[in-house]
C-alpha cells in the first residue's frame, strides 16, 4: 500500500467515524427529545386527571351558601367543614321539608328552633324563618356549638346528638362510663345514628380537602 493510499484509507475511516458519531449524537438528541415530550404529555395527563377528579368530587359533594357557612363558623367558633358536612348529611344542600317537619339546609325541627331561640335570647321567631338559608344555618350552627359545649368539644358526640337527641346520647355516654369506657361510633346503639355520624365525619374531611378556599380554610 502506497503512502498516499494509506492516508486516504485513514481519512476514509476518520470520515466514517465522524459520520457515525454525528448519527449517534443525532439519535441521542432524538431520544432525549422523545423522552422530554413523553414527560410533558405525562405531566399534562396527570394535571388533567387531577382536575377531572376534583370536578367529579365536587359533583358528588355540593356546596352552596359558602359565605353564610364561613360567617357562622367564625361567629360560633366552629369548623366550617363540620357545618358543611352536617348540611350534606341532612339535606345535601337541597332542602325540603321532611315528613317529620324538619326545615331547611340543616333540617331543623320547629321545637328545636324554639329551644335555640330561647337559649340565644332570640325574639320574633317564626317557623317560616327556617326556610331562609342564613337563618337556618345560624340556628343549626348555634345548636352545634351548644352540643359541642355540652360534650366538651367532642365532635362525634355532638354530631350523634344532632341526629338522635341529647337525652339518648347522654344515656349512651353514661352507660359506657358505667362500664369503665367511653362511647365509640361502633357502640352507638341506633344504626341510623351510627351511619349518620360516620357520614358526617367522613364528609367533614372531604369538604376540608375539596373546598378549602370556599370554606375559608386557607
Regions found by a protein language model. Give the residues of each.
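Short juxtamembrane and helix-loop transition motifs at transmembrane-helix boundaries
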Residues: 22, 44, 62-63
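Hydrophobic membrane-insertion alpha-helices, especially the h-region
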Residues: 32-50
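Feature targets compositionally biased, intrinsically disordered low-complexity regions
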Residues: 11, 17, 32, 179-180, ...
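Intrinsic-disorder/low-complexity peptide segments enriched for small residues
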Residues: 1-5, 36, 215
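N-terminal Lys/Arg-rich, disordered targeting/topogenic segments
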Residues: 1-29
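Extended, non-globular alpha-helical segments
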Residues: 23-36, 103
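Catalytic glycan-binding domains that act on GlcNAc-containing polysaccharides
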Residues: 48-218
Amino acid at each position: 500500500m502506497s503512502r498516499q493510499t494509506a492516508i486516504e484509507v485513514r481519512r476514509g475511516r476518520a470520515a466514517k467515524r465522524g459520520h457515525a458519531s454525528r448519527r449517534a449524537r443525532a439519535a441521542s438528541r432524538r431520544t432525549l427529545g422523545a423522552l422530554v415530550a413523553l414527560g410533558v404529555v405525562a405531566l399534562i395527563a396527570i394535571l388533567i386527571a387531577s382536575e377531572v377528579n376534583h370536578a367529579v368530587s365536587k359533583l358528588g359533594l355540593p356546596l352552596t351558601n359558602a359565605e353564610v357557612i364561613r360567617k357562622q363558623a367564625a361567629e360560633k367558633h366552629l369548623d366550617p367543614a363540620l357545618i358543611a358536612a352536617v348540611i350534606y348529611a341532612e339535606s345535601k344542600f337541597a332542602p325540603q321539608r321532611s315528613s317529620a317537619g324538619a326545615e331547611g339546609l340543616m333540617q331543623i325541627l320547629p321545637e328545636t328552633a324554639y329551644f335555640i331561640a330561647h337559649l340565644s335570647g332570640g325574639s320574633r321567631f317564626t317557623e317560616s324563618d327556617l326556610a331562609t338559608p342564613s337563618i337556618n344555618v345560624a340556628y343549626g350552627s348555634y345548636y352545634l356549638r351548644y352540643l359541642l359545649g355540652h360534650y366538651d368539644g367532642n365532635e362525634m358526640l355532638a354530631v350523634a346528638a344532632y341526629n338522635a337527641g341529647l337525652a339518648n346520647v347522654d344515656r349512651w355516654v353514661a352507660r359506657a362510663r358505667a362500664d369503665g369506657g367511653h362511647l365509640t361510633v361502633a357502640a352507638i346503639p341506633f344504626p341510623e345514628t351510627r351511619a349518620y355520624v360516620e357520614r358526617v365525619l367522613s364528609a367533614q374531611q372531604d369538604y376540608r380537602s375539596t373546598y378549602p378556599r370556599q370554606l375559608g380554610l386557607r
